[in-house]
């Protein structure tokens, strides 16, 4: 269950997901064979989240799965998809007293689900606090997801990220290419990509070992999707973290 496969559908082939069958197999219909296993899969924690997401938002499983696997160029396997890992030196930044206390508080939350709010005025250093927390998380071989409310915020945030961590983050939103999406899928699935910055749809990606979800500017109304599949990404982030026991 959860494997992504290519199957014949009408006159062409489509990517589908192996899912549990609640129905009796019809005797008078010939079932076609799977063409190939793509080598990609959805792990059990994401399966649990997809099923919960479907029930809570009253959306058919098929539509949720379309969000999960959409736009990834049919999950072809190319040698260019290799994830290149470079060792980098993360900079050390000096925190003020308030930032240090906030980081200590977050550090007490270990191996359990918790929701914390970092509140402060613009420029007060909230981002630096959660960057430091992410640094602690990835040292334990966990992954981090940072959600942004709008795509246009990505470039500025990416620059701040690179200045702190010393490497370019993986970015996920509707404007990136299918090939890039496929590479990110594989990197997350194999725990090669440690930190992802993304729009709300990034919540449905196959992180192997998700340790923390940051919802930046969580009050922003852009986290509410009101077309197609309707959901609130802030609320869904809390639910996914709870299922995965992320912070």
Segments from the language model and where they lie:
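Accessory, non-ATPase domains that flank or precede helicase/AAA+ motor cores in DNA-metabolism machines
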Residues: 1-247
């Amino acid at each position: 269950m959860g494997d992504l496969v290519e199957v014949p559908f009408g006159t062409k082939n489509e990517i589908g997901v192996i899912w549990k069958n609640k129905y009796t197999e019809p005797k008078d219909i010939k079932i076609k064979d799977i063409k190939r296993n793509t080598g990609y899969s959805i792990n059990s924690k994401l399966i649990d989240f997809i099923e919960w997401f479907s029930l809570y938002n009253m959306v058919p499983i098929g539509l949720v799965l379309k969000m999960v696997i959409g736009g990834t160029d049919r999950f072809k396997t190319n040698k260019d998809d290799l994830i290149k890992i470079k060792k980098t030196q993360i900079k050390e930044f000096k925190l003020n007293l308030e930032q240090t206390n906030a980081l200590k508080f977050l550090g007490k939350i270990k191996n359990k689900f918790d929701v914390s709010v970092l509140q402060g005025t613009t420029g007060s250093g909230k981002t630096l606090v959660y960057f430091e927390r992410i640094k602690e998380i990835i040292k334990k071989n966990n992954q981090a997801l940072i959600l942004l409310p709008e795509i246009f915020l990505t470039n500025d945030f990416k620059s701040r990220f690179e200045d702190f961590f010393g490497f370019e983050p993986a970015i996920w939103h509707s404007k990136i290419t299918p090939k890039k999406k496929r590479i990110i899928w594989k990197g997350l699935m194999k725990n090669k990509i440690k930190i992802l910055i993304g729009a709300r749809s990034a919540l449905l990606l196959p992180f192997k070992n998700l340790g923390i979800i940051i919802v930046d500017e969580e009050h922003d109304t852009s986290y509410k999707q009101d077309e197609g599949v309707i959901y609130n990404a802030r609320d869904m982030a809390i639910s996914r973290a709870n299922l995965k026991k992320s912070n």
